[in-house]
Every structure is written in C-alpha cells, then in structure tokens.
Amino acid sequence: GKLFVMHDHSFYRTTGLREFSWNLTFDEIEQLDAGSFFSDAYAGEKIPGLEEVIQLAKENHVRLNIEIKPSANDKDIEKSVVDLVREMDFADSCVISSQMYGSLQKVKDYDPEISTLYVMSLAYGNINRLKAADGFSMEAGNATPSMVSRIHNAGKQIYVWTVNNRKTINRMIDLNVDNIITDRVALVQECIYDSKTNDVIRQYVKFLREL
C-alpha cells in the first residue's frame, strides 16, 4: 500500500465520506475532496501521499513531524515509514511521533538514529525508562516548569501543541520548551524574535549597571 497523510482514521469529518481509511485503495483516496471542509477556496484539494509531502518539505527546507497512527488493519506501518524516510534521505530532517510507544520501539529497531516523540498527556513516572522516546509531545496546558526540567534532565525534548495565541506562546518560550506546534507560524517566529531581542536588551542593561 501507499502511505498517505490524514489526521483521522475515518474520511467523514474532512471529506464527507463515511468510510475508514483501510477500506479504500490509494487511487480511490486520491479522488476525494479534502479541501472544501476548510474553505471553498481549497475545493478539490486531494489527500496527499507521504512521499509527496516529504518531497515538498525537502524543496522548501522544512522539517516534518511524522505521526504514526497504527491500527489493527495496518501491516507494519512503522517499517514502511522508516523505509520511505531513508529512501528519500530525510531521516535527519524529521521526527517520528506516535501515541503508541510500541510503534516508537519498532521505529528504533529499524533505525536507531531516527528521532522519536512519544505523544502523551503527561510525562509521569520514570521517563528515563522510555528509551525509544527521544522526547515527549503534549498539550501545552499540561506543560509545567517542573515537567520541562524533568524531561530536559533526562536528556530528552518537549514539544507542545497546539499553541495559537501570543500569551501562551510567550509562556511556552519562558518554559524553554524545545518545539511549539502551531497553526500560526509567523506569530511564533515573531514572539521568539521579541524574546531574544528582549534578552539582548536585558543583558546590555545589566552590563551598563555593572560598569
């Protein structure tokens, strides 16, 4: 089968078709309209294949967070993803994430060098034992200073989602999270720039005071 990019297991929410992904061929999937759900301006947009998305990311120097959502109907989807990432020489430009820790273990078995993220509500317990996870991805509201410190002290990273307002973006920057998942990329970039500029100003003021 061919890997494609879709958030849900069912096509209904975004295409109106009451069908599960594993019941259609990719040729049939390509005929669906996945754009009208968002806006008439996107009517006719197709569900993309993962290969197509990776190629677009490479051409535009964009890193990807590839989330694997396995089901009982998938046959070793982890190997298929790893093989495609390797084939397209994209391993250093992506992170593979999943809510299923077993999927991350399989990814690491196939390629220990690929970065992985465990998608979870909270990073609790002994996170050091989760060897197959290079980091954790969680809802931003669950991120706390102590949690960020525990994750960083374990040598792992923390990604937060989905952060779309300035106040929460700035709070995540102050928490020193490693990655902010957002629908408003330009706003996040602006906040990061402002934060760094403010740091420079603070350091300069401190320098002047110490003269």
Segments the model singles out, each with a brief description of its role:
Residues 29, 53, 66, 100, ...:
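Conserved, mostly hydrophobic/aromatic
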Residues 67, 96-98, 162, 181-182:
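Active-site-adjacent beta-strand anchor residues
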